[in-house]
Curated annotation (Swiss-Prot):
Belongs to the SFTPD family. The lineage of its organism: Eukaryota, Metazoa, Chordata, Craniata, Vertebrata. Residues 1-20 form the signal peptide. This is Conglutinin. It comes from Bos taurus (Bovine). Keywords: Calcium, Collagen, Disulfide bond, Glycoprotein, Hydroxylation, Lectin, Mannose-binding, Repeat, Signal.
Amino acid sequence: MLLLPLSVLLLLTQPWRSLGAEMTTFSQKILANACTLVMCSPLESGLPGHDGQDGRECPHGEKGDPGSPGPAGRAGRPGWVGPIGPKGDNGFVGEPGPKGDTGPRGPPGMPGPAGREGPSGKQGSMGPPGTPGPKGETGPKGGVGAPGIQGFPGPSGLKGEKGAPGETGAPGRAGVTGPSGAIGPQGPSGARGPPGLKGDRGDPGETGAKGESGLAEVNALKQRVTILDGHLRRFQNAFSQYKKAVLFPDGQAVGEKIFKTAGAVKSYSDAEQLCREAKGQLASPRSSAENEAVTQMVRAQEKNAYLSMNDISTEGRFTYPTGEILVYSNWADGEPNNSDEGQPENCVEIFPDGKWNDVPCSKQLLVICEF
């Protein structure tokens, strides 16, 4: 602190020349010991002094700590959009990625158009018998059926017990005179005549037939034979019926009737001939139960079938093949109408719903026979 005032005083009392030298010397002395710059404010501007010697470079001090960052400046305005650059070259094809998960199932599509009708398949094997259907309502009393054909003779039955003698029947009406019978047995001897001449010895006669038993036993035996004959006929008819049915596959049984089909499709006349050769006739349902049995066969075969009835003899009057009028019918609404573009409809078909319709007899329909 004392050095500074003394320096000022020396400068003021010394001549300029010596002052400059002394200052130089003093400055050298001062600068040799410390890097201190002395600033003097002259009272008047003197002559410029000589250039002083370059001072030694002082060593740099340690770098100070960085100052705290200043506040962020405001964001500048976005620049203009540059022009679109040229399209780059295509890159190399990458490897296939992994298979993705299966997507959800789409909604079902619209039904396609119906395909053409395929050819008829082969006849399948006979299926197992179905469960018996419910008992149908009692139908109206049927007409008298046609006489059946003569059946095969059945086996001889066991000898039955002797029946009770029957009552004497009323005398029958006198029959027509029959042909001359054989020579009867010798009559009773007449009155003794006069003795004749002795004749030759005759040949021995044949043994006569055994005489009949009493009248009551004969009547009882006849009654017994009549009963056995009735049983035999029923047995023969049933045996013949089942024998014919077995030879004709795929059928339904209702009461004493059996309906069968072989799956054949024919005209009415050919269908009649086929059933006739099988010793049967076309299906003739006479009750709702029989009609239902035929309907089930129509559904199973998926084909309409012929029935036996027709009005070929009298238009509008449908009858059975025997000529009897119908005792049961199940016509569809508005049928029979005899309308097929001018072609007469004299025959009957049955639909899968059991309803009947009149059709031309030339139509090809399923054949169902009745036994």
